[in-house]
A protein has these predicted regions:
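Glycosyltransferase catalytic domains, chiefly GT-A lineage
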Residues: 1-270
Length: 270
């Protein structure tokens, strides 16, 4: 059973993707690592209107693609670990324990916990501090997915992280990731930020793009396929933490040198 680690990095996160690959190798847990970047994406994906917003890097459309692409090349039963390049990897013993869970489950997804104060309102006073999905999904996405649910209880569940995902290659998981990719590819309107004229509910805080789509899908499948949903342990510092969502942007060697020379200049000047 192969264990493969992947990440993606482009533009500001290119150096971070190189750094996290070295962290992954140093853990001596993964049999293979792969770093994707923009040039690895197919032209059909690059032509998506989601890539017109350079600030959001394609609204993370590349994420389900790189996961599906890697899964497609693995054998049945192999394990794929995806992490955002801004994260930091640690604790090899903790990784061994976490991956043991895949003996009985086909995937591990991480949800924001009801018992932690994420202080979302510090970023924007209009944001609700609750991680419930109803606050983090625009109306058009809610309305699109609602018909497949029996009621609206799924919106009272917490949103999932899309920054760390652990998946075993099985037919069910290939189906789920392909559907995630298809929704983001063929319905970019459900992924992008709501337009100014689109009315949102009073409880709406912000639309979370790839995370919102993934959350809706996994909340539908959680009692239909063999997956595990756990409270995340990557935000802030925790004992036995295996991933920290530090959102780290590593400087290139060139920028590090520029910063160093700039600091020397100011010391001499003063």
């Amino acid at each position: 059973m192969k264990k493969k680690f992947i990440t993606y990095g482009s533009n500001a996160f290119l150096q971070s993707s190189k750094r996290i690959i070295e962290e992954a190798k140093s853990l001596n847990i993964f049999d293979e690592t792969q770093r994707y970047e923009y040039s690895d994406l197919p032209d059909a994906l690059k032509s998506s209107p989601l890539f017109l917003d350079k600030k959001k890097g394609g609204h993370w459309l590349w994420k389900p693609y790189v996961i599906y692409d890697s899964l497609s090349k693995l054998n049945e039963g192999d394990i794929l670990i995806y992490s955002d390049s801004g994260c930091e990897l640690k604790n090899p013993d903790g990784w061994k324990i976490e991956l043991e869970l895949l003996k009985h489950k086909d995937a591990i997804f991480y949800q924001y916990s009801e018992n932690r104060n994420y202080a979302f309102s510090k970023f924007n006073p209009a944001f609700n501090d609750s991680p419930k999905l109803k606050h983090w999904m625009k109306n058009s996405l809610k309305e699109t997915f609602q018909p497949i649910f029996d009621n609206e209880k799924w919106l009272e569940k917490n949103k999932l992280m899309a920054g760390v995902i652990i998946i075993k290659k099985t037919p069910d998981m290939m189906m789920v990731i392909k559907q995630w990719l298809d929704v983001m590819t063929f319905r970019p309107d459900l992924v992008a930020d709501p337009l100014l004229f689109e009315k949102q509910s009073l409880e709406f805080s912000s639309h979370r793009h790839d995370q919102s789509v993934l959350s809706a899908m996994i909340r539908y499948y959680e009692d239909k396929i063999n997956i595990l949903i756990k409270d995340e342990m990557s935000e802030y510092d925790h004992d036995n933490q295996i991933v920290k969502a530090s959102r780290r942007v590593d400087k290139t060697e060139e920028n590090q040198l520029k910063s160093f020379l700039k600091s020397i200049y100011h010391r001499i000047k003063n």
